Amino acid sequence: RFVRATFFQLTAPQQASAQESIFQAFHILNNFDIPTGTEQPWGKASADVPSATQFTVATDTQNCIIYYRTMYNSNIRCIDLKTIDFKNIRYYSMPLDNVKRQPVELINIR
């Protein structure tokens, strides 16, 4: 799997912008997601510790933005590190997802 990742990275076309590069990185990383329960014996998957790709991250180091998606929400979200006052912010943690299910948008065809 890591050989394939390297191949995709080395042969992917250069993108015009940082954001297009991030989207391309997620397309490449999609190939390596591990579905829930595939690394556990049949019927033995743990409900509280999923054996799956729990989150995927791509970082724009030029613009200091961290992009991520999770196993519960494949929409790409971002954190702009330039907006954080690291000298004054206190450590805390929070869940990456408020709801543990994929959002689905209904498209009405008229």
What are these regions (language model features)?
Residues R1-R110:
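C-terminus-biased signal that marks the final domain/tail of proteins
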